[in-house]
């Protein structure tokens, strides 16, 4: 009898205990900053996230938008919308040049979102970007462009949640001229896209992230294995906890079988290519150590409040996940502040750049990336290849989780049990006293990022300030300093090389 979940054998077994032998590769700890294309057919309306679900929820903003722009979802559904995605101006070579200039050391491409439409030449899902819409293998093109420039390449899969998420297309309007007329998701001819999940449609109940339907884990597994085998990614990201989390499940529960075998398959594939050493990373969002230690923890739009003993990653976006003409963007100052704060706490930042349906990014995104590129060209030395100092920083400003919004907090916990509280990412008001530290210990260097606008800087958290041999302002040169009472004082020129987060390189004597 064939295995339900065939996986490559090797040093990693499909158990939590075996996968605890994962060690984060140094390349990721050195890289610090990645960019992400969270892009697909849902970008067509340019009207935000979760469009393929919400267009079937009567009265929702996206339902009304769809009704007025495309027609009723019984007549013009998501199967029709995917055909409008053309990506006619998509130039991964030009975009990747920009992303490298902006400082990205790794890149993620989305293989499929919860919409169950695949962005590559899948042999398992006919509803894909080669057969419909662009008629291009989007993921393969991204991969080629990234590897050509020496970037590590990752894929994100959001398929685990699709079975529950994509059931709204089985409904119908409750009132109005189309009352009782089934949405097109009820048409069995399109079940490969819309799925056989009508029995789970009940909008009066909270939505589960992962289904309990026994048919779905094998389907998820064969599709994600296809992705891993096709693209041999350095990183695999699951949008949720380890599949297939169920409430109350322990690390020994068989509900995790498909997820654990996928991680073992991922790692053993790398070990086979690297003399037994795994160089790949699996990301998921359950922040309980007994679960996330099989890879690295990813916290969506969230931050940590102190240095973490293990590397971790925040993923966020300049605007909304999918292109939205209404979105208010982060500016370069906010992104730089996030990056420095995250790196000071042993983390990496993964930033999504929203793309229009034609494949381009807008001028606001381009401007932001160019400004980040200017900053990284000056201060990147204090970011790449560094490790946390004994403290992450000093000063009054804290970027940590916003615990006030209980609704958002509750929603995130349905995505991943034990998840770090959602952070609203309000733009920090950095003061002249705010400092963030990194170090290259083997080189005897500490880096102090002066987050606010300051000319006289006092550093109170250096381990041995009396051993400081020199202080250099990156992008400028040596600056005068003195130490007294355990405090190092440095004096910066009136004209600073960067508009924020200027970086001091502090070299100590042995």
Task: Label every PLM stretch briefly.
Residues 1-510:
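Mature catalytic domains of secreted/periplasmic carbohydrate-active enzymes
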